[in-house]
Amino acid sequence: MRQLKREVKIGNVTIGGNNSIAVQTMLNVPVEDIEGNVAQAKRCEAAGCQILRVTCPSAADAKCIEAVKNAVNIPIVADIHFDYKAALACADVGVDKIRINPGNIGDDDRVKAVVQACQQKNIPIRIGVNGGSLEKHILAKYGAPVPEAMVESALYHVRLLEKFDFNNIVISIKNSNVPRMMEAYRQLSAVTDYPLHVGVTEAGTYQMGLLKSGMGIGGMLLEGIGDTIRVSLAAEPEKEVEAGYNILRAVGFPVAGPEVITCPTCGRTQYPCTEIANEVEKRLQGYKKSIKVAVMGCVVNGPGEAREADIGIAGGKGEAVLFIHGEPIKKLTGDHILDQFMDEIYKI
């Protein structure tokens, strides 16, 4: 059962409570390239990104935040490290949320200045704790970025914001070690009702990043923990968005658009099952209808394995049996099985 947290409004997206889990990503174009950032932001929006983070190393770079915000219709989060004046500048241009890493933002007076700027414009703050940048005294106490250390850091900074009468807060507590990350989120969720942004930081190259994020983020969601997610990948941010939705779909959350399932194939396979499955998925990109499509290798296990699909095929030599809701309908034959199958999919 999902652990319900208080609601926080980020631009036109509300997280927490019973609201849908929002999928985020972060631009990776150099901040000086405003045109490139705007173009990438538009691609992320088209891919379905719901909340978009943009780095802002200095106050002067707030002009990039402003340009991106004016170019898309999704909330923009300013990612702030070290320079608290960058956060103030982003608040001035109307950013929708500010993410700070409390371990490097500076003394309490600087944090207070950021809080006051956000209070004036009702801008939420994400406390972004990262296992790689914990405060020195906390690392000295625990010896490593263990879950208890990360939770202590997060709660310290929550109390700091609360001391300044600020509770428009989101928390993340990321680590590149999946078991540590999961245990940290468990401990944090047990003691706070602020919404949680879930992710695995520094997850690695694309393939390993997908695996670690699937385990970490998916595992947390299955435990009912998480209100917004970001899949961190060494890849284009549009790929992070796609991966985020795939994780949501894999753990049972309703996601608009098609899901293509296929078997791993074996020696019984007599038609290009994998190639057809990949091509079906490619052709269905951007298709908005929520359907499950199965491409199975043979008629031995295929029909049973695809019974929960809306439509599917199970192949044989030069032919494939078409199934709709688990029932065999007809055979598709010849050199154009893929095209025939796509025609049937669009009829569903």
Residue ranges and their predicted role:
Residues 1-26, 119, 282:
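N-terminal amphipathic alpha-helix/helix-capping segment at the start of soluble metabolic enzymes
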Residues 71-74, 92-98, 119-122, 189-195, ...:
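Glycine-enriched alpha-helix->loop->beta-strand junction motifs that scaffold or abut catalytic
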